[in-house]
Amino acid sequence: MVYMRGHRLDYDGWAEEFNLPEWRFNNCLPYFIAGEQYQGDASEWRGKTGRLGVKQADYPDPLYDAFLAAGEQSGQGRSQDLNGANPEGLARLDCTVANGKRCSAATAHLKPALSRPNLTLIHSADTQQILLNGNKAQGVVFTHRGERITINAGREVILCGGAINSPKLLMLSGIGPENHLKDCNIKPRIHLPGVGQNLQDHAKIRLQFESKKRLPFHSINNPFNKLKAGINWMLTGGGMAASNIWEAGGLIRSNSDVTHPNLQYHFGPLGFTISNGKIKVEQAFSLNVDQMRPKSTGEIKLNPSDPYKSPMINFRYMNDPYDLNEMVEAVYMARDLVSQQAFDEFRGAEMKPGDQFKSEEEIKDMLRANIETAYHPSCTCRMGYDDDAVTDSEFRVHGIEGLRVVDASVMPRIVSANLNAPIQMMASRAADFILGRPQLDPVNLEYST
């Protein structure tokens, strides 16, 4: 639900490093603006007429206030709008919410189109292969309720399987690294060595602290409180049941050498433990720290014993020493933030990872054992024009006519933000490319770095 666009230098970096001049930030910004229906104050940075409901989170909780105040006390800063001219510091996060409900891409774009006569939605289907006639994509094969079905494409096949399933499907269709396909007994059709490579994600570490005060979120599992929150939501569309919990966060720099924020906070006014598959809410608060631009990259490969099974995924988190050192800095930054006076009335003992991890080497050992995914896989069918690129600047797969990939896999490098907003922007641009419409005019606004 978090709506964060990414930094200007992310997109300008795509343009400069991967020969993608049309992907500069000023070319992307008009699509961000056009796509959103922002529920806050009018701004040249924000859109009011789009389909995607966006609002700044506003559930009142004193721990959110403490978090923001600690940002100013620590020198980590404060931003009024992380999607505006100053995307650095701590802030209340933007979320894709409309009328107290999550506003997803399906809510905003798919559901309103389901009645169209030229659209058929088939769910719970498993796509098996892209059909090729020479070097032209002509359809797909999928299974649905035990039946194997072939669909021919009128113009193009557009693959939107995500950073894991898109490269898998390309490889099942003979498009990918030739030697790996042969190892899986798949006839190579097009040798694209970059398919499944360059896998990137935001690595994450969670810090959790006991709260000396018991606050409303800490009692949310109480049946009476659940009922109360549900009734309040049904009557008003607001309250605790309309919150996504992670309503505050920030973008910060761990050191002065980085060009733009390299760490992201997500702050929640509760803690939790998981036992036997059940979540127990704790009287605590949580601070997630995500690494925005890791140097480590992984890969997606088919399972040679059965390529149609789930692929083999190796993120290789912390494989590059730079990433491990940066995440050590992240732990120190997060602890410094929580040590500020604003948290004094709330801060109890550090529950996770625990204050027994003090030295750099102790923290490195802890990170190796406890690093988590932020669930932002990307970059496995990346755009570009070098030998390892899979798609071009208009999402077309190199060497194949009538085949595009439109999802997070085409990012040349992961952006410094949650992927929700960037992917919706990219999909909007893809629609114009596919239909042959001109791209929206660039928007040039003053931007603080």
List where the protein language model places each region.
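Periplasmic solute-binding protein
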Residues: 1-16, 174
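A glycine-rich dinucleotide-binding beta-alpha-beta segment and adjacent secondary-structure elements
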Residues: 97, 122-133, 263-274, 281-288, ...
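Conserved redox-cofactor binding core of oxidoreductases
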Residues: 15-137, 206-230
